[in-house]
A protein has these predicted regions:
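Class I SAM-dependent methyltransferase Rossmann-like catalytic core
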Residues: 1-43
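Conserved class I S-adenosyl-L-methionine
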Residues: 43-53
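Conserved SAM-binding loop of SAM-dependent methyltransferases across substrates and taxa
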Residues: 54-66
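Glycine/threonine-rich flexible loop motifs
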Residues: 117-129
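Class I S-adenosyl-L-methionine
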Residues: 155-217
Length: 217
């Protein structure tokens, strides 16, 4: 880790705030913003957090869903245990994950997943889109009616097509970039609310650039 990176991180107000408040990552502020703006969580909400490590989003969801809420965090990497948080070790694309989740349904499905960065932006963008498609495929199976889906994606020419794939299944779909996202970052979030379980499903396309996703998730 270079000195320049360390200095930039220390100068980051969201990083400092996360350290001060004992949060697991600065990404927690992104989800807090999205909930404040779009009212994702209600008391007692059932939340599925995909690509959850180190757990920053899961803890925000746990706090906002309240003591009667349920949060299931999914990641192949370890997540520190927290009272009320159920951790499932697994990968989103693994068919066994659906079996491990059982028959439960969720009010909110979150995905802050990122691909392994190759350094070729077109490839990284396409892989991020494919991760959203994997998360969406699972969300369509487990979301309760009127539920919400939130997913990170890297900006690029495939995002419009991705939004068109999401839109038939939800009453509202928007794109946004939280203030806590770093200015140079290409990340944005697709926020979909009002899940329609009976909407017809399209066959999932595969981006040629993402033929080998090589994801961390």
């Amino acid at each position: 880790m270079g000195r320049r990176f360390v200095d930039q991180r220390r100068a980051d107000p969201y990083y400092r705030a996360a350290q001060r408040e004992g949060l697991r990552s600065r990404a927690a502020f992104k989800l807090a913003y999205l909930d404040d703006r779009f009212h994702l969580f209600r008391p007692g909400a059932r939340v599925l957090d995909l690509g959850a490590a180190p757990g920053g989003w899961s803890l925000i969801a746990l706090d906002r869903a309240g003591p009667t809420g349920t949060v299931v965090a999914v990641d192949p990497r370890p997540i520190a245990p927290t009272e009320g948080l159920r951790v499932v070790r697994g990968r989103v694309g693994d068919p066994a994950l659906r079996e491990r989740l059982g028959s439960r349904s969720f009010d909110v499905v979150l995905s802050d997943m990122s691909p392994s960065i190759s350094g070729a932006y077109a490839t990284d963008h396409a892989r991020s889109v494919d991760l959203v498609r994997s998360a969406l495929e699972l969300a369509l199976r487990v979301l309760a009616p009127r539920g919400a889906f939130v997913a990170k994606v890297f900006a690029g020419d495939l995002v419009d097509e991705l939004v068109l794939e999401v839109r038939p299944h939800f009453a509202e779909v928007v794109r946004t970039k939280p203030p806590a996202s770093r200015a140079p970052s290409s990340e944005l979030y697709v926020v979909a609310r009002g899940f329609r379980p009976n909407a017809p499903r399209r066959e999932r396309p595969v981006s040629p650039e993402a033929a080998r996703p090589d994801s961390d998730i």
